[in-house]
Amino acid sequence: MHNQAPIQRRKSKRIYVGNVPIGDGAPIAVQSMTNTRTTDVEATVNQIKALERVGADIVRVSVPTMDAAEAFKLIKQQVNVPLVADIHFDYRIALKVAEYGVDCLRINPGNIGNEERIRTVVDCARDKNIPIRIGVNAGSLEKDLQEKYGEPTPQALLESAMRHVDHLDRLNFDQFKVSVKASDVFLAVESYRLLAKQIEQPLHLGITEAGGARSGAVKSAIGLGLLLSEGIGDTLRVSLAADPVEEIKVGFDILKSLRIRARGINFIACPTCSRQEFDVIGTVNALEQRLEDIITPMDVSIIGCVVNGPGEALVSTLGVTGGNKKSGLYEDGVRKDRLDNDDMITQLEARIRAKASIMDEARRIDVQQVEK
């Protein structure tokens, strides 16, 4: 029930990764990267499908060898989500996956080779209508920039990015997006701010090598949150040393928190105290797992007592306010029923699913009316 975020997004050029629009006001795409061996086709396909199920818009796959490129061909045939091939060192691999229908090429110009090799990749991408992501990383800056700046700085990342943007401009190729990633939050944020002022191309956001599931999520939320709140960013990846599925979940959580893009349930829950009338923590944890399949955007407040419960319920799609033995259930700000505290999880799950079904049907009717 909360309004859309009052964020003025940076104007950027529109490109497409497969059928996913990027830039020019398109929804911010959430992506992840497989961590299986690409040559293990079955494992990689299974992981990509798991990422699709939790809402991944785009999936990146590392293609380090020609054997991996041959595996990529088989993988591409078995999945629906657009795939980005991550290419380093050997430009010929980029040419090979282009033959196999890759949706986007991610190259690091600092290690892909000389200008002639970059030209060959760009010409191939142009012929096959494949966009490119220029991926600049603080950990792999060109040697001359390392010597010039002494260490990774925002200016160094910007210069690296602009060097390769200018190269693509000279080749008259504009179907690309750019990233300037670093593991340091402030370095990454300032680099993106500088780049956003220099080009109109879409920007792919990320805090690279952010860390484990908890620390990486925190660093990404801070870094990406700062940029997104300033209107910077057209696609994002939360990089975690964890199951890639968690990257998608955290990515959507960041967008939901900023009210930029909603998918699934936004749970609002109190941290609990001695006033709670039912097990709030257990209820929230159980419902988050049980309701992962719900993609309908809605706010659900679960508050253990009457101090803040009614106020949160007023601005939630569904809200529960703790009471003695039974807790009040609100729908769209109106108190509707009381739920047994001892059976809270089952009852609330049923109410949420029913509400999601009603909302989905209402949206379906609205779409049909627009199409008429």
Curated annotation (Swiss-Prot):
Q: Name one GO molecular function term.
A: iron ion binding
The chemistry this enzyme catalyses reads:
(2E)-4-hydroxy-3-methylbut-2-enyl diphosphate + oxidized [flavodoxin] + H2O + 2 H(+) = 2-C-methyl-D-erythritol 2,4-cyclic diphosphate + reduced [flavodoxin]
> What does the record say about how the cofactor binds?
Binds 1 [4Fe-4S] cluster.
One Gene Ontology BP term is:
isopentenyl diphosphate biosynthetic process, methylerythritol 4-phosphate pathway
Q: What does this protein do?
A: Converts 2C-methyl-D-erythritol 2,4-cyclodiphosphate (ME-2,4cPP) into 1-hydroxy-2-methyl-2-(E)-butenyl 4-diphosphate.
Q: Which family does it belong to?
A: Belongs to the IspG family.
Q: By what name is this protein known?
A: 4-hydroxy-3-methylbut-2-en-1-yl diphosphate synthase (flavodoxin)
Q: Which organism is it from?
A: Citrobacter koseri (strain ATCC BAA-895 / CDC 4225-83 / SGSC4696)
Q: What is the lineage of its organism?
A: Bacteria, Pseudomonadati, Pseudomonadota, Gammaproteobacteria, Enterobacterales
